[in-house]
Amino acid sequence: MAIHLYKTSTPSTRNGAVDSQVKSNPRNNLIYGQHHCGKGRNARGIITVRHRGGGHKRLYRKIDFRRNTKDIYGRIVTIEYDPNRNAYICLIHYGDGEKRYILHPRGAIIGDTIVSGTEVPIKMGNALPLTDMPLGTAIHNIEITLGKGGQLARAAGAVAKLIAKEGKSATLKLPSGEVRLISKNCSATVGQVGNVGVNQKSLGRAGSKCWLGKRPVVRGVVMNPVDHPHGGGEGRAPIGRKKPVTPWGYPALGRRTRKRKKYSETLILRRRSK
């Protein structure tokens, strides 16, 4: 991804940095509308998720996370922008006439061929079971449950690593640093997700943030005591507590929120790093 830096000709473009324009011309049979009503509110109209609202209308692109078109070669026809994720998507034309969207692997260009199945070449963009991959392979779009489709390492620039295979399980190191076990029969896609420079983007102004459906975030220390536990005081006062808390009084910044009795607790060999 090429980052385009704006000149400081106007306040709205000062310090702005966006990626190069990637057009989006989705196929009608691969998109459908979304019903965004409330934006962070429940059925009674009460805010349940803060900092959401507004935003441009979007059409959802149907992404093939399962990659269940086995042993049929497909060709990358377009690389498109997707407003629902940071990663780009590719339109694939398969040999049997079917057309599907997949996540854009890093380095893939228009005209490349991909395939999914067992014993397929270890090539960027190909999807195959973990049992057929050599150790050290960089992968993304990893299944947790066989046949459910990829659920791990799908964000822009995400990549996991296959570090061991023993018995019926494979050991993966995920982008978060977590090391966990997954069935060797689960599938994954070879390579890294594209658009790795997305973290270098700078929106440059508040209006661009509003287009994404994100409302302003206000610090609790500048609120009144009735609105936040950190609020109140004369001038720039400290929070008045030993440790920071959420707006509802629960400990924040460091407290573990994962449930202790999850089914996957025995599958995680090393928890993700902060």
From Swiss-Prot:
Read off the NCBIfam families from this record: rplB_bact (TIGR01171)
Enumerate the Gene Ontology biological process terms.
Answer: mitochondrial translation
Q: Per its record, how is this protein called by name?
A: Large ribosomal subunit protein uL2c
* Entry's transmembrane regions: none
| Entry-linked Gene3D superfamilies | 2.30.30.30, Nucleic acid-binding proteins, Ribosomal protein L2, domain 3
- Protein family (similarity comment): Belongs to the universal ribosomal protein uL2 family.
Indicate the quaternary assembly.
Part of the 50S ribosomal subunit.
**Where found, per UniProt?**
Plastid, Chloroplast
The GO cellular component terms are: chloroplast; mitochondrial large ribosomal subunit
Q: What does the UniProt keyword field contain?
A: Chloroplast, Plastid, Ribonucleoprotein, Ribosomal protein
